[in-house]
Amino acid sequence: DSILLGIGMTPLDLMLQVFAKKDDPFSGGRTYYSHPSLKDEDKPKIIHQSSATGMQAIPTTGVAMGIQYRELQGLAEDFGGKNPVVVCSLGDASCTEGEVSEALQMAALKQYPIVYLVQDNGWDISANAAETRAQDMTKYMRGFNGVEVKTIDGTDFDLCYQTMQEVFDTVRKERRPFVVHAKVPLLGHHTSGVRKEWYRDDLEEAATRDPYPKLLQ
Protein backbone atom coordinates (compact mmCIF):
# COMPACT_ATOMS: atom_id res chain seq x y z
CA ASP A 1 0.00 0.00 0.00
CA SER A 2 2.83 2.42 0.81
CA ILE A 3 4.27 1.96 -2.68
CA LEU A 4 0.87 2.63 -4.25
CA LEU A 5 0.37 5.77 -2.17
CA GLY A 6 3.88 6.84 -3.07
CA ILE A 7 3.18 6.73 -6.82
CA GLY A 8 0.07 8.86 -6.45
CA MET A 9 -2.82 6.53 -5.61
CA THR A 10 -5.20 7.69 -2.89
CA PRO A 11 -6.54 5.88 0.19
CA LEU A 12 -9.94 5.96 -1.51
CA ASP A 13 -8.50 4.12 -4.53
CA LEU A 14 -7.26 1.34 -2.25
CA MET A 15 -10.52 1.07 -0.31
CA LEU A 16 -12.52 0.82 -3.53
CA GLN A 17 -10.69 -2.43 -4.24
CA VAL A 18 -11.11 -3.70 -0.68
CA PHE A 19 -14.88 -3.36 -1.06
CA ALA A 20 -14.92 -4.59 -4.70
CA LYS A 21 -16.52 -1.42 -6.03
CA LYS A 22 -17.03 -0.79 -9.74
CA ASP A 23 -14.89 2.35 -9.50
CA ASP A 24 -11.91 0.34 -8.22
CA PRO A 25 -9.10 1.73 -10.46
CA PHE A 26 -7.26 -1.59 -10.61
CA SER A 27 -9.89 -4.05 -11.80
CA GLY A 28 -13.35 -2.55 -11.42
CA GLY A 29 -13.95 -4.66 -8.31
CA ARG A 30 -13.02 -7.96 -9.97
CA THR A 31 -9.82 -8.93 -8.15
CA TYR A 32 -8.76 -9.65 -4.58
CA TYR A 33 -7.58 -6.70 -2.51
CA SER A 34 -3.87 -5.82 -2.56
CA HIS A 35 -3.69 -7.13 -6.13
CA PRO A 36 -3.16 -3.91 -8.11
CA SER A 37 -2.79 -3.56 -11.86
CA LEU A 38 -2.47 -0.14 -13.44
CA LYS A 39 -2.00 1.54 -16.81
CA ASP A 40 -2.53 5.22 -15.93
CA GLU A 41 -0.60 7.57 -18.20
CA ASP A 42 0.82 9.60 -15.30
CA LYS A 43 1.96 6.70 -13.09
CA PRO A 44 4.28 3.69 -13.23
CA LYS A 45 2.64 0.71 -14.91
CA ILE A 46 1.70 -2.33 -12.80
CA ILE A 47 1.12 -5.65 -14.56
CA HIS A 48 -1.68 -7.94 -13.38
CA GLN A 49 -0.72 -10.70 -10.96
CA SER A 50 -2.25 -13.82 -9.48
CA SER A 51 -2.18 -14.84 -5.82
CA ALA A 52 0.49 -17.52 -6.29
CA THR A 53 3.39 -16.53 -4.02
CA GLY A 54 6.41 -15.27 -5.95
CA MET A 55 4.80 -15.59 -9.36
CA GLN A 56 5.27 -11.87 -10.06
CA ALA A 57 9.01 -12.46 -10.54
CA ILE A 58 8.64 -14.06 -13.98
CA PRO A 59 6.32 -11.54 -15.70
CA THR A 60 8.18 -8.55 -14.29
CA THR A 61 11.47 -10.02 -15.47
CA GLY A 62 9.78 -10.54 -18.83
CA VAL A 63 8.94 -6.84 -18.96
CA ALA A 64 12.62 -6.06 -18.30
CA MET A 65 13.52 -8.49 -21.09
CA GLY A 66 11.18 -6.64 -23.45
CA ILE A 67 12.68 -3.28 -22.52
CA GLN A 68 16.19 -4.59 -23.18
CA TYR A 69 15.13 -6.05 -26.53
CA ARG A 70 13.65 -2.75 -27.68
CA GLU A 71 16.80 -0.91 -26.63
CA LEU A 72 19.10 -3.34 -28.45
CA GLN A 73 16.96 -3.13 -31.59
CA GLY A 74 16.84 0.65 -31.57
CA LEU A 75 13.09 0.65 -30.91
CA ALA A 76 13.07 2.17 -27.42
CA GLU A 77 11.02 5.26 -26.68
CA ASP A 78 12.66 8.44 -25.45
CA PHE A 79 11.72 9.04 -21.81
CA GLY A 80 13.51 12.34 -21.50
CA GLY A 81 16.90 10.75 -21.00
CA LYS A 82 15.71 8.49 -18.17
CA ASN A 83 15.90 4.84 -19.14
CA PRO A 84 13.02 2.79 -17.68
CA VAL A 85 13.55 0.48 -14.71
CA VAL A 86 11.36 -2.48 -13.72
CA VAL A 87 10.63 -3.09 -10.02
CA CYS A 88 9.55 -6.49 -8.70
CA SER A 89 8.25 -6.33 -5.11
CA LEU A 90 8.62 -9.56 -3.13
CA GLY A 91 8.35 -10.88 0.40
CA ASP A 92 11.28 -12.80 1.84
CA ALA A 93 9.38 -16.08 2.06
CA SER A 94 8.36 -15.93 -1.59
CA CYS A 95 12.05 -16.12 -2.52
CA THR A 96 11.91 -19.88 -1.79
CA GLU A 97 9.60 -20.36 -4.78
CA GLY A 98 10.87 -21.75 -8.07
CA GLU A 99 9.59 -18.82 -10.10
CA VAL A 100 11.94 -16.46 -8.26
CA SER A 101 14.94 -18.67 -9.01
CA GLU A 102 14.01 -18.84 -12.70
CA ALA A 103 13.62 -15.08 -12.91
CA LEU A 104 16.91 -14.31 -11.13
CA GLN A 105 18.77 -16.79 -13.33
CA MET A 106 17.71 -15.02 -16.53
CA ALA A 107 18.11 -11.51 -15.10
CA ALA A 108 21.67 -12.37 -14.10
CA LEU A 109 22.50 -14.11 -17.37
CA LYS A 110 21.05 -11.45 -19.68
CA GLN A 111 21.63 -8.41 -17.44
CA TYR A 112 18.09 -7.06 -17.46
CA PRO A 113 17.28 -3.58 -16.04
CA ILE A 114 15.29 -4.76 -13.02
CA VAL A 115 15.28 -4.19 -9.26
CA TYR A 116 13.95 -6.96 -7.00
CA LEU A 117 12.76 -5.24 -3.81
CA VAL A 118 12.53 -7.87 -1.06
CA GLN A 119 10.73 -6.89 2.14
CA ASP A 120 12.03 -9.28 4.80
CA ASN A 121 9.87 -9.38 7.93
CA GLY A 122 10.98 -12.86 8.97
CA TRP A 123 7.56 -14.43 8.42
CA ASP A 124 5.83 -16.59 5.81
CA ILE A 125 2.15 -15.96 6.58
CA SER A 126 2.09 -17.87 9.90
CA ALA A 127 5.47 -19.65 9.80
CA ASN A 128 8.71 -17.95 10.80
CA ALA A 129 11.93 -17.86 8.80
CA ALA A 130 13.56 -20.75 10.67
CA GLU A 131 10.62 -22.99 9.76
CA THR A 132 10.60 -22.18 6.04
CA ARG A 133 14.14 -21.63 4.75
CA ALA A 134 17.65 -22.89 5.39
CA GLN A 135 19.44 -19.55 5.23
CA ASP A 136 19.12 -15.82 4.84
CA MET A 137 17.73 -15.25 1.35
CA THR A 138 20.56 -12.85 0.45
CA LYS A 139 23.06 -15.74 0.68
CA TYR A 140 20.99 -17.55 -1.91
CA MET A 141 20.61 -14.52 -4.18
CA ARG A 142 24.31 -13.68 -4.05
CA GLY A 143 24.89 -17.03 -5.72
CA PHE A 144 23.65 -15.60 -9.01
CA ASN A 145 26.68 -14.03 -10.68
CA GLY A 146 25.77 -10.66 -12.14
CA VAL A 147 23.16 -9.63 -9.57
CA GLU A 148 24.23 -7.01 -7.02
CA VAL A 149 22.60 -7.36 -3.59
CA LYS A 150 22.18 -4.59 -1.02
CA THR A 151 20.77 -5.14 2.48
CA ILE A 152 19.30 -2.13 4.30
CA ASP A 153 17.33 -1.25 7.42
CA GLY A 154 13.85 -0.98 5.96
CA THR A 155 12.64 1.05 8.95
CA ASP A 156 14.99 3.96 8.15
CA PHE A 157 13.12 6.12 5.64
CA ASP A 158 16.06 8.36 4.73
CA LEU A 159 18.36 5.39 4.18
CA CYS A 160 15.75 3.59 2.08
CA TYR A 161 15.08 6.65 -0.06
CA GLN A 162 18.77 7.30 -0.65
CA THR A 163 19.53 3.64 -1.42
CA MET A 164 16.68 3.29 -3.90
CA GLN A 165 17.69 6.52 -5.64
CA GLU A 166 21.26 5.24 -5.98
CA VAL A 167 20.11 1.84 -7.24
CA PHE A 168 17.70 3.34 -9.78
CA ASP A 169 20.38 5.73 -11.04
CA THR A 170 22.81 2.83 -11.48
CA VAL A 171 20.29 0.63 -13.29
CA ARG A 172 19.26 3.51 -15.58
CA LYS A 173 22.91 4.02 -16.57
CA GLU A 174 24.43 0.54 -16.43
CA ARG A 175 21.36 -1.60 -17.31
CA ARG A 176 21.92 -4.46 -14.88
CA PRO A 177 19.88 -6.19 -12.15
CA PHE A 178 19.84 -5.45 -8.42
CA VAL A 179 18.32 -6.99 -5.31
CA VAL A 180 17.47 -4.58 -2.48
CA HIS A 181 16.85 -6.55 0.72
CA ALA A 182 14.99 -4.46 3.31
CA LYS A 183 14.78 -5.77 6.87
CA VAL A 184 11.41 -4.76 8.33
CA PRO A 185 9.08 -5.77 11.18
CA LEU A 186 5.72 -7.41 10.58
CA LEU A 187 3.34 -5.02 12.32
CA GLY A 188 -0.07 -6.12 11.09
CA HIS A 189 -1.96 -9.30 10.28
CA HIS A 190 -1.28 -11.26 7.11
CA THR A 191 -5.00 -11.05 6.35
CA SER A 192 -8.12 -10.62 8.45
CA GLY A 193 -8.31 -14.42 8.55
CA VAL A 194 -4.73 -14.95 9.79
CA ARG A 195 -4.46 -12.86 12.91
CA LYS A 196 -1.04 -12.20 14.42
CA GLU A 197 -2.10 -12.91 18.02
CA TRP A 198 -2.81 -16.54 17.16
CA TYR A 199 0.73 -17.58 16.37
CA ARG A 200 3.26 -14.86 17.26
CA ASP A 201 5.13 -14.16 20.49
CA ASP A 202 7.33 -11.35 19.11
CA LEU A 203 4.77 -8.56 18.89
CA GLU A 204 6.41 -6.34 21.50
CA GLU A 205 9.82 -6.64 19.84
CA ALA A 206 8.34 -5.89 16.42
CA ALA A 207 6.65 -2.78 17.79
CA THR A 208 10.04 -1.38 18.84
CA ARG A 209 11.06 -1.37 15.16
CA ASP A 210 7.95 0.42 13.91
CA PRO A 211 9.24 2.89 11.26
CA TYR A 212 6.48 5.46 11.79
CA PRO A 213 7.67 6.82 15.17
CA LYS A 214 11.23 6.93 13.79
CA LEU A 215 10.06 8.98 10.82
CA LEU A 216 8.36 11.51 13.09
CA GLN A 217 11.41 12.04 15.32
Question: Whereabouts are the PLM-identified features?
Answer:
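Conserved phosphate-handling catalytic cores of large alpha/beta enzymes
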Residues: D124-A134, T138-R176, G188
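Short coil/turn segments at beta-strand junctions that form active-site/ligand-binding loops
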Residues: P84, Y112, E174-R176
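Glycine/aspartate-rich loop-and-adjacent alpha/beta segment that forms the canonical ThDP
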Residues: L14, T170-Q217
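Short internal beta-strands
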Residues: Q111, Y116-Q119
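Electropositive phosphate-/nucleotide-binding environments in soluble metabolic enzymes
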Residues: L5, M9, T53, G154-Y161, ...
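Short beta-alpha connecting loops at secondary-structure transitions
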Residues: D120-A127, V147-I152, V194-E205
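Cofactor-binding active-site loop characterized by glycine-rich and histidine/acidic residues
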Residues: D1-K110, N128-T138, R142-G146
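Acidic, glycine-rich active-site loops and adjacent beta-strand->loop/helix elements
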Residues: D1-I3, L90-T96, M106, V118-D124, ...
